[in-house]
């Protein structure tokens, strides 16, 4: 039968066991960070501080947090309740990628959702932060959030003093904000505003469309122009000599990499460009939670702590690990690995957990303790 015991008590006791054996991951300048937490009974408590890692361990044991956070900012007086009194000294640059902000088609399993978010995270790190912006790999820390996403911490002297507006410029660039068929040609022609991966990808795709114009006619051009009957006369006009060009057609100019072609766009060309920009944004943009990045006083999950909605550990990983990372295998709390618990399921539930597909049937099931904690925390199950 289903227990009358409150599952919250069961979860708190499990978390208590974890924090008793907890060895916190080292955090630089932890004594200059604000600490916050959400207990099992109550709301967020902020403006705490610790003297070092040993004190942090004791803090976890005493409070048994459902969620444990630390500030991405450094302060002279992190325990002060008024933000101005904390005396801000700088902050890491943070990117939060979460399933709440990323479209995942269909009705995916939890682990499949994590795969999609992981791909966005890897793209952000490799294509934008490293390749495009040129950040030092050693300055980047990636952590699995313990829930449905990843956090990226950038630690660099060139970053710490950036204000919110400067950080917003970075998020706007990564998300491709402000790119449209009017602004892009203008920024290309005057050499301002857009460089790097966006310029390269849009220009490459533009050239490709007009190089493969015959195969493009029945798909992209039709969608862009909004009327299949407009495609043939449009292509015919492209084959004519371009205005301002002594001998070349617009089609020839449009197939050549570089900024020249954007000086010859008419209204229909801009419709095609708008469609190309939309497709490129869909392909390479990264959906990040902008308020997290722009907030220079942000609290974020502490590495090594448990996520209260999953029981999974907030886990640091390197960039190579991110390429094939499986949080539901790698982020399980070792203290629970040899125990089981009986749970009652109102409905069947399928998940890849611990590297294996697990089909949990409706009714009573005996499952590994960490999986049971996950199901209880997700409110997918009840204790029996």
Question: Where is each model-derived feature located?
Answer:
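SsDNA-processing nucleotidyl-transfer enzymes
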Residues: 17-107, 290, 310-312
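Catalytic micro-motifs at enzyme active sites that drive phosphoryl/nucleotidyl and oxygen chemistry
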Residues: 78-85, 129-144
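Histidine-centered divalent-metal-coordination microenvironment in nucleic-acid enzymes
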Residues: 92-95, 135-165, 169
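Long, well-ordered alpha-helical scaffolding segments within enzyme catalytic domains
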Residues: 110-137
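Long, charge-rich alpha-helical interaction segments
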Residues: 172-289, 293-296
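C-terminal accessory/binding modules appended to enzymatic or scaffolding proteins
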Residues: 287, 294-297, 303-314, 321-371
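Basic amphipathic alpha-helical segments that dock to polyanions
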Residues: 374-375
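A short, conserved structural fragment
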Residues: 379-384
């Amino acid at each position: 039968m289903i227990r009358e015991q409150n599952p919250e008590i069961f979860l708190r006791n499990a978390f208590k066991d974890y924090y008793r054996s907890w060895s916190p991951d080292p955090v630089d300048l932890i004594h200059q960070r604000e600490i916050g937490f959400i207990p099992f009974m109550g709301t967020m408590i902020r403006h705490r501080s610790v003297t070092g890692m040993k004190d942090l361990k004791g803090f976890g044991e005493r409070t048994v947090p459902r969620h444990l956070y630390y500030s991405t900012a450094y302060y002279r007086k992190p325990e002060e309740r008024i933000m101005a009194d904390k005396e801000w000294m700088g902050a890491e640059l943070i990117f939060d990628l979460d399933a709440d902000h990323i479209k995942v088609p269909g009705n995916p399993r939890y682990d499949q959702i994590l795969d999609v978010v992981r791909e966005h995270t890897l793209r952000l790190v490799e294509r934008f932060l490293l390749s495009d912006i040129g950040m030092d790999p050693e300055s980047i820390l990636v952590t699995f959030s313990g829930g449905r996403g990843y956090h990226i911490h950038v630690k660099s002297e060139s970053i710490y003093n950036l204000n919110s507006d400067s950080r917003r410029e970075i998020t706007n660039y990564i998300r491709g904000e402000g790119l449209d068929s009017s602004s892009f040609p203008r920024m290309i022609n005057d050499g301002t505003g857009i460089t790097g991966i966006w310029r390269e990808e849009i220009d490459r795709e533009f050239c490709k469309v007009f190089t493969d114009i015959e195969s493009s006619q029945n798909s992209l051009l039709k969608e862009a122009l909004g009327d299949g009957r407009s495609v043939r006369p449009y292509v015919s006009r492209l084959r004519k000599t371009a205005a301002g060009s002594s001998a070349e057609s617009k089609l020839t100019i449009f197939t050549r990499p570089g900024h020249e072609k954007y000086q010859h766009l008419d209204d229909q060309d801009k419709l095609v460009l708008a469609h190309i920009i939309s497709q490129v944004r869909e392909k390479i943009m990264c959906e990040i939670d902008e308020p997290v990045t722009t907030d220079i006083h942000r609290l974020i999950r502490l590495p090594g702590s448990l996520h209260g909605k999953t029981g999974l550990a907030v886990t640091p990983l390197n960039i190579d690990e991110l390429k094939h990372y499986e949080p539901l295998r790698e982020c399980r709390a070792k203290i629970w690995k040899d125990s089981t618990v009986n749970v009652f399921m109102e409905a069947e539930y399928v998940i890849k957990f611990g590297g294996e597909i697990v089909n949990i049937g409706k009714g009573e099931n005996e499952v590994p303790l960490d999986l049971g904690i996950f199901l209880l925390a997700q409110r997918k199950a009840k204790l029996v």
